[in-house]
Amino acid sequence: MIVIPDVILLGASAILGLYLGWAYLRRLPRRPVLVGSHLLLGAAGLEIMVVLLRGTPSGQSLALGVVGALAISLTALALLSGLIAGLIARRSRRTADVTLATHAAVAVAGFGLFVAWAIKA
């Protein structure tokens, strides 16, 4: 049950990301505080995932396996693509659509794999 805080952090980031995506599609004004919170929750979740690579605080080793390694890789790629999306999306609406769709797809895959790994851990 050591992975529960990470599931909560990444789940909150995913829910906030869903809201931000919905607001983007509705062309509502962007709220930098929500975008920053989404970024911080995702980064904190990724940090805990990386810390769990070394084992739990009690010294117990978690079997990472291919699923866990892929979940960490996809979550890191989602964080990177989200940062890139924020930088290059200001050029055109089409560029923003493609980068945000890529970010969302990678993030959903990473979160899904992480939850699958967390259930086994």
Task: Annotate the PLM regions.
Residues 1-121:
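Membrane-embedded alpha-helical bundles that constitute the cytochrome b-like, heme-associated redox core
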